[in-house]
Amino acid sequence: MSAAGIDVLPKQCLLNWADRGGGAVTRLRALVLLVQFPDLPADAADHGVPYFESLMFGKGPLDTRTLRNFYLDNSYGTLSVEGDVYGWYTLPNSSSFYAKGSGGVCDTCYPRNAQGMAEDAVELARPFVDFSRYDNDGPDGVPSSGDDDGYVDALFVVHSGSTYEDTGNPGLIMSHQWNTVAPIPVNGVYAFVYTTEGESSKLGTFCHEMGHVLGLPDLYDRDYTSYGLDLWSLMAAGGWLG
């Protein structure tokens, strides 16, 4: 697949899938932090905590469009993504400060990039969130039970407004998975790897970034030499299907 200009599926990802056999349900607790830019306030009335609780963790029939249901269905009932939503918290800097004309993904621009935004989000949430509840990747699936790795497993930083990929405006943040410059100690664990999406992002974007949390690679064409897997994969253009 690398010859086609798309990522190679990591061997460890395949091993992890093999280890999930037997039909046992893995419950992964995710943390969603809602943050707004001072120059771009969120539409908290329409996109408050209840909206994102429903979008991310809503239950109901499997044909109900939620991130939890998507992964429960596609894992044949073996992965249940659950969690909590906090915010909106107001960031100390503007959207353009963090985007810095590059969608926020300039790796030499810290703190003027999305890493700085994620770090600020963690600090804003620190007084209100017990981050240790979201380190639950050990064999027993119980947070802080002694068999976890000491890192928050799934951290979503949802910012107000739209995104670079949806508008073509590099003054907005691009949705992605990344990590902070250094692990952030909080409640006895570390916040480090995060994903970020926009307030207006569709479910497909959240599911795509959750795929990265689980170890899935991008399968779209990253160097424009092929079509990649196009609409046939969530990790390619399928993430744009809504």
Annotate each predicted stretch with a short phrase.
Residues 1-241:
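Active-site-proximal segment of zinc-dependent metalloprotease catalytic domains
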